[in-house]
């Protein structure tokens, strides 16, 4: 399928985009994550990544040279990195060749000047497809799935990009696995070999576990981590995702935390993106009495309530 994206609206730009077309024509393969362009508050790139990218650019005071995305899907996150960060070289990966090939075409055809950006890409596990490239990325972005596929489901069967194959050969700390942060940990472990000097990984993480768990995640991966931005969003694909967390909760993981969207809206009402990171733990504390377990959240969802979760952008860099 193909979608049309109004960039000015999608990225909340003050004027016309500088580097990408005004309207993106994006082909989305059957196995790629489908952007939520009809409801931007549910869209990871527009609602979570884009504000963080703008803040990165503001803090740096200049464009970045190189940007990478792990698990790009349609490539819309890479186009966002090009537009908001001014990246001249981009690397991107995804698990399946068909997804990466489509993403590359999407990126090329939606640039105002296709020759202005160097592309490095490949299909495979996390950052490994980029191992023979230039590496040294200033910004590495990842929004990887947390919920494993059920045993009888294959990654190729349907649009399973919100899930991952649980069987891994790498050693994963028990703490990380209990918090369902396996892929984020593995991405951080790999990333140190792909970062430029003073580069950082920006992990977009659904706050279904305590913020302290994210800081510990970075430490266990051998990096120095901080909460860069903190916000919330309505749970996308709630039937699938919340029930998935509830099942993992019953299996002994977690407990996980969700909230009614109305409670999240109140807690974040007066919080700017710029101030959100430094106030994250205080905001989390204010929501303590409103949190729901995954099981409770699923029951509330089945009764018609709108369920959401907090979102942290974790900034991790080499110590």
Task: Give names to the regions the model predicted.
Residues 248-257:
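Alpha-helical transmembrane segments of integral membrane proteins
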Residues 177-233:
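Conserved Class I SAM-dependent methyltransferase catalytic core
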Residues 118-123, 225-239:
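A generic structural motif
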Residues 2-89, 256-258, 262-315:
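SAM-dependent Rossmann-like transferase core, predominantly class I methyltransferases
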Residues 44-152, 156:
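Conserved SAM/SAH cofactor-binding pocket of Class I
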Residues 139-183:
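Mobile active-site "lid"/loop adjacent to the S-adenosyl-L-methionine
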Residues 239-249:
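Short, surface-exposed amphipathic charged segments that create phosphate/polyanion-binding patches used
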Residues 144, 316-319:
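C-terminal beta-strand of the catalytic ATP-binding
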């Amino acid at each position: 399928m193909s979608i049309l994206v109004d960039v000015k609206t999608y990225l909340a730009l003050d004027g016309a985009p500088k580097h990408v077309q005004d309207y993106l024509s994006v082909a989305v393969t059957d196995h790629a994550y489908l952007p939520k362009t009809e409801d931007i508050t549910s869209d990871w790139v527009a609602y979570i990544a884009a504000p963080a990218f703008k803040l990165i650019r503001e803090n740096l005071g200049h464009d970045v040279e190189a940007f990478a995305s792990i698990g790009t899907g349609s490539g819309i996150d890479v186009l966002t990195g090009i537009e908001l960060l001014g990246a001249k070289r981009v690397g991107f990966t995804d698990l399946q060749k068909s997804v990466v090939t489509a993403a590359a075409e999407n990126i090329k055809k939606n640039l105002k000047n296709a020759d202005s950006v160097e592309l490095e890409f490949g299909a495979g596990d996390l950052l490994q497809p980029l191992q023979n490239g230039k590496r040294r990325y200033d910004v590495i972005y990842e929004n990887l799935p947390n919920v494993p596929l059920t045993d009888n489901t294959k990654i190729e069967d349907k649009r399973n990009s919100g899930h991952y194959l649980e069987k891994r050969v790498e050693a994963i700390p028990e703490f990380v696995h209990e918090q369902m942060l396996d892929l984020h940990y593995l991405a951080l472990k790999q990333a140190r070999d792909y970062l430029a000097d003073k580069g950082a990984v920006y992990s977009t993480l659904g706050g279904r576990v305590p913020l302290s768990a994210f800081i510990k995640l970075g430490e266990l991966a051998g990096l120095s981590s901080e909460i860069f931005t903190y916000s919330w969003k309505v749970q996308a694909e709630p039937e699938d995702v919340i029930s998935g967390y509830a099942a993992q909760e019953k299996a002994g993981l977690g407990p996980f935390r969700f909230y009614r969207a109305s409670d999240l809206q109140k807690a974040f009402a007066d919080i700017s993106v710029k101030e959100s990171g430094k106030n994250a733990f205080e905001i989390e504390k204010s929501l303590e009495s409103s949190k729901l377990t995954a099981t409770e959240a699923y029951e509330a969802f089945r009764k018609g309530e709108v369920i959401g979760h907090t979102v942290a952008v974790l900034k991790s860099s080499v110590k």
